[in-house]
């Protein structure tokens, strides 16, 4: 805390600094100039970390504004955390409006290039957040008939947070009514015609609310002796009814609920226990509801429609329509087909490329040996990158990760690997059936894993986590899968060009993933446009990529169960194509070296790739800038 305030005091400040001056650019410009002078000082010997890597010196006049916005939003999310709360919606609506007025009052023309980029990022983020808040409100209307009692639960916890005086007798009456209302809702469910997606959203909402409900009870039960006398029996009845109703909703929906984890690679020792105990209807084997692999079980959140897709693509700065993106995917598919036939012929299978894929899938390591394969493959990729001076890899990034096992339950949703702080590996477990164990081995064979490991670790997600935690951290509110997943897959494309895949088996393994990314665009957008059913998506993956059924079902289940936004699966290929086009523009032209380009790619932060392009090419930016980069030239 001392060092932070001390650092601020060293920046030369304008003599007259008032709110009008700041908003119109005077204060921000002067502060930016002061930051620039401070950073140009070369005699302080304070520009590098202990490992010799440069410290973050990314300056922007809007950096402080974004940092304040982020921490304020975090506080509001913490205070108004109850989903479905009217108070939460109203407070966020006011907050976004106030922030937008503040941003739009900035003197845009006085900003530096980085400041203008940050202006566009923050303004675009706020506009999208407002639209998302309105969309969330419409979703509330969908689930409201299923959980008409949720406001009673929300009201209890919000009153506690406002530190209102508790009346234990009144609480007992509320709990008694709550149990009755839940039973009535369960009875009404039998006549409900709502979609599986809506039923599942309601189930997930009850899981969330039950946590707050129990926290409310535990708080007063500990501190108020009268509370226990009045409410023990009533709470037990209401809590059990809430749990049973959540499980009933989830079972009726037939949706494989999103795992209650912490996102990519953020594994903790208690995660498996949490998943098993908190997911509605969680059991080792699914024994109720629609069969695994059925349309209802796979279709998850259901199709969102063209309007939602277009809004999401606009926010991600992708200037193509869903139909155009499917065309791009099919053109990339055609390239993959040609390369796959070439590799298949070299392996002796001629035009029967599926036999080549089958041969590769059967080249897997023995059970128990996957962890050592992953270790060796990660080291091979690092050596390749460093030998060719493609990117600067800080020493610590090679040291601060390890492997964890993907549990059998997790493999139902993600049958491959995930990465980040750790790499989670899908490998067979003794509790799985023989068929499941074989498909886990085949789906993560030596050649499929060769591309997966560096995608998840270095230079992929693990290195991304490391770098975004150290460079332009303030830009994290603008993170996008088109940067995260796109960059990781871009490395697969670049390493292919540079000869990392030498043998035909290695090329088949890499091509399966490339075809997979093409297929993700086709099947996910087609599903949301109601051109494909979930079962047809599974068959498409089996036919066009060569996946085993369990792996294809896991992929579809993961795509539509609500764990990821509707366009997330498009981000791998499209983001990679953006990075690839930018590499050709800057490295292919000789304007930057590979190392300089890739270092900058990480150090500018996790932002839309079009904004990274503006940061690197110095293009003039106007206040009303709209996405315009047609990065896929054959459709331009």
Where do the protein language model's features map onto the residues?
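N-terminal maturation segment of proteins
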Residues: 23, 28, 40-636
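C-terminal segment of classical bacterial N-terminal signal peptides
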Residues: 33-37
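N-terminal secretory signal peptides and thylakoid transit peptides that target proteins
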Residues: 10-30
């Amino acid at each position: 805390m001392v060092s932070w305030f001390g650092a601020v005091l060293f920046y030369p400040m304008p003599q007259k600094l008032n709110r009008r001056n700041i908003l119109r650019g005077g204060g921000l410009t002067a502060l930016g100039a002061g930051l620039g002078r401070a950073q140009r000082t070369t005699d302080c010997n304070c520009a590098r970390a202990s490992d010799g890597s440069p410290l973050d010196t990314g300056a922007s006049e809007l950096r402080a504004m974004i940092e304040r916005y982020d921490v304020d939003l975090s506080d509001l999310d913490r205070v108004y955390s109850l989903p479905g709360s009217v108070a939460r919606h109203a407070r966020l609506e006011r907050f976004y409006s106030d922030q937008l007025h503040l941003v739009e009052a900035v003197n845009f023309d006085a900003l530096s290039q980085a400041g203008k980029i940050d202006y566009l990022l923050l303004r675009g983020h706020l506009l999208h957040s407002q639209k998302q808040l309105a969309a969330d409100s419409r979703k509330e209307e969908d689930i409201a008939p299923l959980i008409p009692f949720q406001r009673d639960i929300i009201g209890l916890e919000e009153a506690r947070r406002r530190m209102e005086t508790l009346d234990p007798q009144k609480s007992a009456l509320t709990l008694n009514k709550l149990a009755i209302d839940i039973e009535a809702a369960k009875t009404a469910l039998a006549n409900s015609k709502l979609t599986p997606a809506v039923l599942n959203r309601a189930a997930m909402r009850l899981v969330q609310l039950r946590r707050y409900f129990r926290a409310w009870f535990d708080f007063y039960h500990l501190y108020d002796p009268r509370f226990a006398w009045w409410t023990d029996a009533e709470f037990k009845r209401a809590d059990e009814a809430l749990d049973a109703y959540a499980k009933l909703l989830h079972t009726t929906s037939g949706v494989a609920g999103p795992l209650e984890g912490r996102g990519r690679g953020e594994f903790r020792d208690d995660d498996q226990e949490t998943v098993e105990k908190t997911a509605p209807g969680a059991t080792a084997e699914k024994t109720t509801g629609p069969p695994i692999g059925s349309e209802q079980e796979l279709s998850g959140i259901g199709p969102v429609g063209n309007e939602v897709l277009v809004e999401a693509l606009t926010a991600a700065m992708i200037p193509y329509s869903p139909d155009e993106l499917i065309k791009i995917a099919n053109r990339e598919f055609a390239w993959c087909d040609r390369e796959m036939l070439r590799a298949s012929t070299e392996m002796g299978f001629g035009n029967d490329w599926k036999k080549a894929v089958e041969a590769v899938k059967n080249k897997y390591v023995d059970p128990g040996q996957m962890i050592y394969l992953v270790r060796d493959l990660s080291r091979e990729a690092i050596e390749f990158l460093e030998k060719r001076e493609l990117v600067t890899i800080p020493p610590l990034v090679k040291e601060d990760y390890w492997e964890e096992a993907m549990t059998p339950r997790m493999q139902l949703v993600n049958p491959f690997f995930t990465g980040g702080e750790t790499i989670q590996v899908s490998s067979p477990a003794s509790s799985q059936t023989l068929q499941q164990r074989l498909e886990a081995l085949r789906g993560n064979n030596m050649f499929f894993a060769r591309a997966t490991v560096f995608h998840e670790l270095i230079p992929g997600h693990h290195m991304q986590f490391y770098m975004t935690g150290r460079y332009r951290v303030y830009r994290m509110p603008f993170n996008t899968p088109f940067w995260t997943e796109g960059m990781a897959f871009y490395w697969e494309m670049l390493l292919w060009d540079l000869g990392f895949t030498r043998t035909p088996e290695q090329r088949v393994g890499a091509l399966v993933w490339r075809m997979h990314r093409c297929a993700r665009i086709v099947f996910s957008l087609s599903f949301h446009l109601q051109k494909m059913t979930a079962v047809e998506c599974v068959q498409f993956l089996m036919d066009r990529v060569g996946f085993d059924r369990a792996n294809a079902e896991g992929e579809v289940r993961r795509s539509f169960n609500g764990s990821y936004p509707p366009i997330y699966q498009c981000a791998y290929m499209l983001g990679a194509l953006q990075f690839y086009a930018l590499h050709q523009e800057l490295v292919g032209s000789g304007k930057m070296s590979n190392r300089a380009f890739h270092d900058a790619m990480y150090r500018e932060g996790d932002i839309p790739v079009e904004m990274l392009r503006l940061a690197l090419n110095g293009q003039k930016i106007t206040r009303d800038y709209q996405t315009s980069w047609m990065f896929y030239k054959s459709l331009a």
